[in-house]
Amino acid sequence: RGLGDVYKRPELYQAYNTLFEKHWEEQTGQKVRIIQSHGGSGKQALEVANGLDADVVTLALEGDIKTISDSGLIDPGFTSEFPDDSAPYTSTIVFLVRKGNPKQIKDWDDLLRSDVSVITPNPKTSGGARWNYLAAWYYFEGQGESEEDITEHMKTLYQNVLVLDSGARGSTTTFIENGQGDVLIAWENEAFLSMQEEPGEYEIVVPSASVLCQPTVAVVDEVVDRRGSRAVAEEYLNYLYSDEAQKLAGENYYRPADQDIAKQFYTEEGTHAVSYTHLTLPT
């Protein structure tokens, strides 16, 4: 049986798919082949809504899945279909800077400086980029700024963006491989992966305010009912909450929804933004 999967992060799901294929065969005796599509969350949502057959979607934010739901492909109430508002893991927004932090970037207001060039994806195509936008807005709102002033700050910030890639991975490539920009606004897991892949070349800066990002998962009801794949699709998403999959999420620098497993990967560091945690690099 084939399972079409539109997803957010290639490394996590490449490993998870192997885990799930083994699990499904052990449980049912059936082999399953998972066909994947990866890209900016907003763009992926539009492609599914416009006819790309996917049995399941794992996207950056609830709103992208609502786009598919609004097209009639996913039943309303999808956030209650799985535990933790159908978010099996979470992340937050941090800054990735080059070794030594040469521009001394500490917080969101530093991204408004004329000498700082920023890399972040395009909020029109990337769900992750919308979390970046919200985190910046949240910071300025916390400074007591008016909506008018915050809007001007956001304009300034985006005027400092060198390249608006369509997705988070494209922005990481622009910053890491192409060497463009002074700071990458990134999901925590993306920042840690970059540090793992290029040891000693980058540093993570934790801004004073951020947001808790909740990637959402859903079964595409119209597709699974038409294809007769509901059982495997639902189990694919349910198994994300298994101990094995939760550990895999932590190993890929996400914050597992299972708090007992999450504790294996973080140390507490409080801020006023969220109940903030730092994932430590797995040994």
PLM region descriptions:
Residues 87-92, 153-158, 164-166, 197-230, ...:
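Periplasmic-binding protein-like
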Residues 51-57, 116, 178-183:
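Alpha-to-beta junction loops
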Residues 224-279:
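Extracellular/periplasmic juxtamembrane helices and adjacent flexible linkers that interface
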Residues 8-11, 41-44, 63-66, 101-102, ...:
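Solvent-exposed loop/turn segments at secondary-structure junctions
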Residues 2-6, 278-283:
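Short, small-residue-biased leader/transition segments that mark boundaries at the very start
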Residues 69-142:
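A conserved helix-loop-strand patch within extracytoplasmic ligand-binding domains
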Residues 143-208:
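Ligand-binding pocket segment of bilobal, Venus flytrap-like solute-binding proteins
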Residues 1-71, 81-82, 187:
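Early extracytoplasmic/lumenal segment of secretory-pathway proteins
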